[in-house]
A protein has these predicted regions:
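Catalytic His-Asp segment of secreted/periplasmic serine-dependent ester chemistry enzymes
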Residues: 171-240
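N-terminal secretory targeting modules
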Residues: 1-60, 64-70
Length: 240
């Protein structure tokens, strides 16, 4: 098993946090039964499951996933580390199967996400793409879902013993830099993700429960950086 996973060179942290040196993805065994079918597709909000749950989880996604390694909890420990995080800046769902973005310590080969998952063999995956697939107000998520579905199928084929949880596209701030990004599209894409999860047997993590202001329909105050898209430390803390 590799000692470290190095993010794509574009995923450069903007701030630093103390990384827990003992954190590691705990491998699932070939007898591990993924996805408890008694749990509803949309996972309900629950109490904090503790650090062991986080350390047993492989987080996959775009620059917001990178931020899980950049911010720390109140003990000074990063929410996730390079050992259980595959976050790539500017990546969308269409690149899951094709983009060679991951390197392992002592190995010069670049791996796609499915190939990296096969090497890490996690017990659980929380995957979040979609922010880089947005643009305009169209509510037609057909292409987005087809790309996501293909990526998830490739991950499942590479390592079929992990529970897969699809994380919602996070809400935007009303005062965002790119006004071509709309909550109309975010909501439509998230609804399509729920349907995909229901049809394909994945679970859906509705992060809007903690990130969205129900009164406005946008992200809660101070939950994004100044661009109105990337999650702030406050938001990541609430997420975890």
């Amino acid at each position: 098993k590799p000692q470290d996973v190095l993010p794509d060179h574009t995923a450069t942290p903007e701030t630093s946090a103390t990384v827990a040196p003992t954190a590691a993805v705990v491998q699932a065994t070939a007898t591990h039964a993924p996805t408890d079918t008694t749990v509803p597709t949309i996972l309900p909000q629950t109490a904090d499951a503790g650090r062991s749950y986080v350390d047993d989880t492989l987080f996959i996604g775009d620059s917001n996933t990178v931020r899980y390694t950049m911010y720390a909890d109140d003990t000074g420990t990063a929410f996730s580390t390079l050992k259980n995080n595959i976050g790539v800046v500017s990546m969308g769902a269409g690149s899951i199967t094709t983009l060679k973005c991951e390197k392992f310590k002592g190995d010069s080969t670049l791996y796609t996400i499915p190939d990296a998952v096969a090497k890490l063999q996690p017990k659980r995956i929380i995957i979040g793409f979609g922010s880089n697939n947005l643009g305009g107000s169209s509510t037609d998520a057909t292409k987005f879902i087809a790309q996501y579905r293909e990526g998830l199928a490739a991950i499942t084929k590479a390592w079929p013993y992990a529970d897969i949880i699809v994380s919602a596209i996070p809400p935007l701030d009303q005062q965002r830099d790119n006004t071509n990004l709309t909550m109309t599209q975010v909501d439509a894409y998230n609804a399509a993700l729920v349907t995909m999860c229901e049809e394909d047997g994945y679970k859906f993590l509705n992060t809007a429960e903690v990130l969205r202001d129900d009164a406005t329909g946008w992200a809660k105050k101070d939950y994004t950086l100044s661009d109105g898209v990337h999650l702030s430390k406050e938001a990541v803390t609430a997420y975890f």
